[in-house]
């Protein structure tokens, strides 16, 4: 029986972000904003690096280039430059994480400390989303992500002037 769980505020860190390191095959991440983020005392990019080293697929879609701290962290993990599948699209505003094509988080939280991360309760954003293994929702999220990933919107896009790294 499928489940749908409402996720709010700090539960994003406990219920969603903690699942990334446990994927068996792949993780697809879509976010408007991405910043240096930690899981416990470990950089999130270190977690992604470990996944790639163990042969997992990691895809990252985001709307804009991250800041200098993120880029410094990124450079500490050479496997990311080599194996991380990454694309930019300035129209990305969805926030979703697909775990092994079987489970999906869909919600408001960006991949930042104030969004999905572990910023203190007094400083974090108020976020809401769902975590589910409902096939219809997982399939729809995968299709939306993959259509952007394949450049399915690029030909008719009205924001090409803002696209620094076109998908197609």
Regions found by a protein language model. Give the residues of each.
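PLD/PLD-like phosphodiesterase catalytic module centered on the HKD motif
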Residues: 1-168
